[in-house]
Swiss-Prot record:
Disulfide bonds: none annotated. Ca(2+) 1 binds at D50, D52, S54, F56, E58, E61. It holds the Pfam family EF-hand_7. GO terms for cellular component: axon; axon terminus; cytoplasm; dendrite. Residues 37-72, 76-107 form the EF-hand domain. This is one of two major parvalbumins found in the white muscle of pike. One of its GO terms (molecular function) is calcium ion binding. Belongs to the parvalbumin family. In muscle, parvalbumin is thought to be involved in relaxation after contraction. It binds two calcium ions. The modification N-acetylserine is found at S1. Ca(2+) 2 binds at D89, D91, D93, M95, E100. It comes from the Eukaryota. This is Parvalbumin beta.
C-alpha cells in the first residue's frame, strides 16, 4: 500500500464500503488511516490518486478512487463521486487540488 497505510486497515475500509452507494469519504479516510497521517503522507496519497499528474484530482479519477487502494475494488457510483467532489472542491473549479484534498482529510 502507499502513504504507510496498513494492509489490514485498507482491507477493512474497502470492505465497509463494498456495497454501491455505501462509500462515505470521511469514514473511509478515518478507517483506512489517512486521517491520522502526516500532511506529507496525505500529499503522497494525493499524488498517487492524481493518475494523470495534472496536479488535480478530476471526477474520472475520483470515480476510480478505491482502486488506488486495491485493483479489485469497485468504481464509485455517480452519486458517490459527485458527493465526494462537492465536499472537496472548495473553489468550484470541478477538481480537487492538493490543498483541498488535505483539508478534506484533516477536517
Amino acid at each position: 500500500s502507499f502513504a504507510g497505510l496498513k494492509d489490514a486497515d485498507v482491507a477493512a475500509a474497502l470492505a465497509a464500503c463494498s456495497a454501491a452507494d455505501s462509500f462515505k469519504h470521511k469514514e473511509f479516510f478515518a478507517k483506512v488511516g489517512l486521517a491520522s497521517k502526516s500532511l506529507d503522507d496525505v500529499k503522497k496519497a494525493f499524488y498517487v490518486i492524481d493518475q494523470d499528474k495534472s496536479g488535480f484530482i478530476e471526477e474520472d479519477e475520483l470515480k476510480l478512487f478505491l482502486q488506488n487502494f486495491s485493483p479489485s475494488a469497485r468504481a464509485l457510483t455517480d452519486a458517490e463521486t459527485k458527493a465526494f467532489l462537492a465536499d472537496g472542491d472548495k473553489d468550484g473549479d470541478g477538481m480537487i487540488g492538493v490543498d483541498e484534498f488535505a483539508a478534506m482529510i484533516k477536517a
